[in-house]
Amino acid sequence: MSAEKTIELNGKSYPMLADGEYDVIILGTGLKECMLAGLLSKKGMKVMVLDRNGYYGGECASLNLEELYKRFKGEMPEEKIQKKLGSSRDYCVDLIPKFLMSCGKLSDILYITGVTNYLEFQCIEGSYVFSGKSKQVAKMPTTVEEAMNTPLLSFMQKLKYKNFLTGINKMDIPGEDGVDSDEDVPLNRMTTRELYKKYGLDDNSQDFTGHAMALHLNDDYLDEPATETVKAIKLYGYSVNAYGQSPFIYP
């Protein structure tokens, strides 16, 4: 039986991992590191990924209660508090939000790089928004039936919104739908505010369209060309159709 191969580091001997020879060593197990490892391994390289933490994910990690306390407090709380909080494994706290649009570019990149071979995704059961008009939380509709019953829209707005979405689906997007990326389409010469006005959408309809569907962070987009907003709304629709409950998936 051959002796175990070791490597010397700072005066100590450590057993070699695999055969001890790698083309690339990547430090960290965050999203970008995993994507890089996947791309390099697809090229036939031997890749070793190391992480100084006791958990995977880097800045994108999901931590149990013990890991969370050690990261932000340095140590666990006293025993009586631990008992009150329950089992550490019952907690899974994301360090950053991880919702992905199911048909978005990041989802495509994860698939191409092979990261999806090591991750499982599940569809979020629903998306909810707070309506300033009705002062209540409501589910974003994903079916015709839900759209007709949602409190987010008045009856007249539901009819106008149906026409709006029908119109959106027929609009040409540069670089998509068989349209050249540099082609000058009508959307480039129209602001989003003008687009909303064309279909008669009120402020409430504009709010949840721009922020809950197109995911704009503020209202600056209203006076910008409507192309990017229409593209985002279409992506939202494609992503909902992919799974039927919500446009978002979660690893």
Where are these regions (language model features)?
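Glycine-rich Rossmann-fold phosphate-binding loop(s) that bind the pyrophosphate
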Residues: 28-30
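Rossmann-like flavin
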Residues: 94-97, 105-250
